């Protein structure tokens, strides 16, 4: 790495990736630098990014497994080397990559004798396995073996109290954290009043996304977190004015779209998917996270409902409104999402 002397405080901040490698299918590493920073800024940015990387990035995991005729998780099945508990632990380690939202079903159905690996999981189209060689179980005898699985995308670490299942279904402690570890360090350079800092950031991921992708997503999450303050300052509104603005009159979309239901030539709104609105991916993903999949789902929401969606911004609301106004064959009220 070539280090350049920082001589002025007016230089533009720049990110650089100084090292990137793949140690294994489930271990990616990236090293980045941000410079030049004033004294104290590197620590501020480093702490915020580390927390966002470890706690705010979404991941996909297997969250439940259902076996047939199994009284408890410590049971063993004749012809299988591992106990049910060991199989559950192996399923917990499976690393998945997806952009799904909500819960999806998957399954394993094989006949022994053979080794069962992650490659044997039958997945929905939107999910893929990072390392297909991850072991699950060893069938020693010619038996049929089936497991029903549930897959979910979320963030953080989720645990669920295990009880003796009557139907053979058991929860799996899910680690929705694709970033395994984050370290940052600070290097000071310059003299006197021209002293500056360089932030070094190291990121390890589980292979479901690259360190660069993780850094981008964490940065976007932090930006979205501070956008409300920026908008308030730009518009010159006081705190009281801002508070009043955050409680706008409810938009009862249902009345406005009564005519739409009649004018769509018999096409029900629950058959018009939000994919057809051609929204930007960020806005689209916000709606999908809130289980808004069709136009009927969208039009049943008030403005307050939409603004409660995580990472949903006023610009997203305005964009949705403009899109509906452009494409729907009715007159819509103007400026409901004023910026």
From Swiss-Prot:
Any one GO CC term of the record:
chloroplast
Q: What class of enzyme is it?
A: transferase
What keyword terms does UniProt attach to this protein? Chloroplast, DNA-directed RNA polymerase, Nucleotidyltransferase, Plastid, Transcription, Transferase
User: Domain of life here?
Assistant: Eukaryota
User: Where does this protein reside within or beyond the cell?
Assistant: Plastid, Chloroplast
Quote the InterPro entries the UniProt record gives: DNA-dir_RNA_pol_insert, DNA-dir_RNA_pol_RpoA/D/Rpb3, DNA-dir_RpoA, RBP11-like, RNAP_asu_C, RNApol_insert_sf
Reaction(s) catalysed by this chain, per the record, are: RNA(n) + a ribonucleoside 5'-triphosphate = RNA(n+1) + diphosphate
One GO BP: DNA-templated transcription
Where is it mostly found? plastid
Q: Cite the GO molecular-function annotations of the record.
A: DNA binding; DNA-directed RNA polymerase activity; protein dimerization activity
Name the SUPFAM superfamilies on file: C-terminal domain of RNA polymerase alpha subunit, Insert subdomain of RNA polymerase alpha subunit, RBP11-like subunits of RNA polymerase
The record, for SMART domains, names: RPOLD
E.C. number: 2.7.7.6
Where are the residues of the annotated region Alpha C-terminal domain (alpha-CTD)? 266-339
Region described as Alpha N-terminal domain (alpha-NTD): spans on this chain: 1-233
Q: NCBIfam families from the xrefs?
A: rpoA
**Free-text note on domains in this protein's UniProt record:** The N-terminal domain is essential for RNAP assembly and basal transcription, whereas the C-terminal domain is involved in interaction with transcriptional regulators and with upstream promoter elements.
Q: Can you state the subunit structure given in the record?
A: In plastids the minimal PEP RNA polymerase catalytic core is composed of four subunits: alpha, beta, beta', and beta''. When a (nuclear-encoded) sigma factor is associated with the core the holoenzyme is formed, which can initiate transcription.
Give the protein's biological function. Answer: DNA-dependent RNA polymerase catalyzes the transcription of DNA into RNA using the four ribonucleoside triphosphates as substrates.
What family does the entry list? Belongs to the RNA polymerase alpha chain family.
The protein here is known as DNA-directed RNA polymerase subunit alpha
């Amino acid at each position: 790495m070539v280090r350049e002397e920082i001589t002025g405080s007016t230089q533009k901040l720049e990110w650089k990736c100084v090292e990137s490698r793949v140690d294994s299918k489930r271990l990616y590493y990236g090293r980045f630098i941000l410079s030049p920073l004033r004294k104290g800024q590197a620590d501020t940015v480093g702490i915020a990014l580390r927390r966002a990387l470890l706690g705010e990035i979404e991941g996909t995991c297997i969250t439940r497994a259902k076996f047939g005729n199994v009284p408890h998780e410590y049971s063993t099945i004749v012809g299988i080397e591992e106990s049910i508990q060991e199989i559950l632990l192996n399923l917990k380690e499976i690393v998945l990559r997806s952009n799904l939202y909500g819960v999806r079903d998957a399954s394993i159905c094989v006949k022994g004798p053979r080794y069962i690996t992650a490659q044997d999981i039958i997945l929905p189209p939107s999910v893929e396995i990072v390392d297909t060689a991850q072991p699950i179980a060893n069938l020693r005898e010619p038996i049929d073996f089936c497991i029903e699985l549930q897959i979910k995308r979320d963030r953080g670490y989720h645990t669920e109290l295990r009880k003796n299942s009557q139907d053979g279904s058991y929860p799996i402690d899910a680690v929705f954290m694709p970033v395994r570890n984050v370290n940052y360090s600070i290097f000071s350079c310059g003299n006197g009043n021209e002293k500056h800092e360089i932030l070094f950031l190291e990121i390890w991921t589980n292979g479901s996304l690259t360190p660069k992708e993780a850094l981008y997503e964490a940065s976007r999450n932090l930006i979205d977190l501070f956008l409300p303050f920026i908008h308030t300052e730009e518009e010159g509104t006081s705190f009281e004015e801002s508070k009043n603005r955050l409680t706008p009159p409810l938009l009862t979309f249902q009345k406005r779209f009564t005519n739409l239901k009649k004018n769509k030539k018999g096409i029900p709104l629950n058959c018009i998917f939000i994919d057809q609105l051609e929204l930007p991916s960020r806005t689209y993903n916000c709606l999908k996270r809130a289980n808004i999949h069709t136009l009927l789902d969208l039009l049943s929401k008030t403005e307050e409902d939409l603004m409660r969606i995580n990472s949903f911004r006023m610009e997203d609301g305005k964009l949705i409104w403009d899109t509906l106004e452009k494409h729907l064959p009715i007159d819509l009220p103007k400026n409901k999402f004023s910026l």
